[in-house]
């Protein structure tokens, strides 16, 4: 693939993941939520609470500042709290959790392969991020000195749409000044990979789970997209 000039990456579950293991359980979540009470609640009820809050945040397509992001996540945790009255979350605690989600740049941790591969690839290609996320994601990259490796960072809430809308990929290509056949895209979602394929970008479906990787590798036979188990696998294709 000698004509490749740019590599586009999803962020979450590709380059980094939540330090707590859950996107909306923030690093200081247990400072404000009684863990014993939380763990005594049926998991189905907890899933429902997060799902209701998630339904709300997904309606907020355009979030261009961290200030508005905070407003939205205060509402998010209010909805979450209303579904779980057992937690007895006060308005102050709700505000503190939301603040932790928006203003704590240590909420995500970068994967080992990302820490190794990204600096290497940045020497050979233009790199871009195409992520369904909010403005605070930029702080995570800045805190980890990772913005230096990327020529473009496209965040869905800032442009008002999300993957697999073609606007996400086309905006990234335009920012990097490359054509679709000069770029590749890596995501942990097949749907998003297929969205990239629709605009002519070769995609790589990242499956970090070994069993899922093996299964999806077999299913990908004859398909345009490729399946990889690690970012290290990119080296044999680029």
Feature names for model-found ranges:
Residues 1-7, 17, 119, 134-238:
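Asp-based, Mg2+/Mn2+-dependent phosphohydrolase catalytic module
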Residues 24, 28-32, 45, 52, ...:
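Alpha-helical elements of Rossmann-like donor-binding domains used by nucleotide-donor carbohydrate transfer enzymes
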Residues 42-51, 91-103, 201:
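Short, well-structured alpha-helical segments
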Residues 71, 89-91, 99-128, 166:
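Short, acidic loop-to-helix structural element flanking the phosphoryl-transfer center
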Residues 131:
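Conserved phosphate-coupling serine/threonine residues in phosphotransfer and NTP-handling enzymes
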């Amino acid at each position: 693939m000698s004509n490749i000039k740019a590599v586009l990456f999803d962020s979450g579950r590709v380059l980094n993941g939540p330090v707590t293991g859950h996107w909306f359980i923030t690093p200081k979540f247990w400072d404000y939520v009684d863990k014993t009470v939380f763990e005594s609640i049926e998991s189905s009820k907890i899933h429902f609470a997060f799902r209701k809050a998630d339904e709300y945040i997904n309606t907020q397509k355009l979030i261009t500042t961290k200030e508005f992001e905070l407003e939205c996540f205060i509402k998010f945790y209010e909805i979450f709290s209303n579904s779980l009255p057992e937690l007895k979350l006060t308005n102050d605690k709700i505000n503190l959790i939301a603040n932790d989600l928006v203003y704590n740049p240590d909420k995500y941790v970068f994967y080992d392969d990302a820490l190794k591969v990204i600096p290497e690839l940045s020497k050979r290609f233009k790199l871009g991020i195409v992520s369904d996320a909010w403005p605070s994601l930029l702080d995570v990259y800045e805190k980890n000195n990772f913005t230096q490796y990327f020529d473009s960072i496209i965040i869905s809430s800032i442009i008002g749409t999300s993957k697999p809308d073609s606007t996400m990929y086309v905006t990234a290509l335009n920012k990097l000044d490359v054509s679709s056949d000069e770029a590749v895209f890596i995501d942990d979602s097949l749907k998003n990979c297929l969205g990239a394929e629709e605009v002519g970008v070769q995609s790589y479906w990242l499956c970090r789970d070994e069993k899922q990787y093996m299964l999806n590798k077999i299913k990908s036979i004859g398909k345009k997209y490729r399946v990889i188990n690690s970012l290290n696998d990119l080296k044999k294709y680029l």
